[in-house]
């Protein structure tokens, strides 16, 4: 029987607790890359069930599940134009920081 060829692997799987002073909740980052190091899947999320109980507490998120790049925001989902993974990370960070300034 032929051995299965690995075409992608999880490069990053991180969860960071946000202090109550900085807004509470968790930042979640998952990134999968192919054998050449190109990002093929990702999931970035700010989770805080005190702010939003729907969508498993995901307040803000970006991912490319189900074959499309999209943004989650308080339960709503909208498509995003994919330029690069770095661009997606910058958008996610900007959204999260903007949310903190609204409080």
Describe the predicted segments one by one.
Residues 2-70:
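The feature represents the first ordered module of a protein
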Residues 75-103:
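Short, compact, well-ordered microdomains
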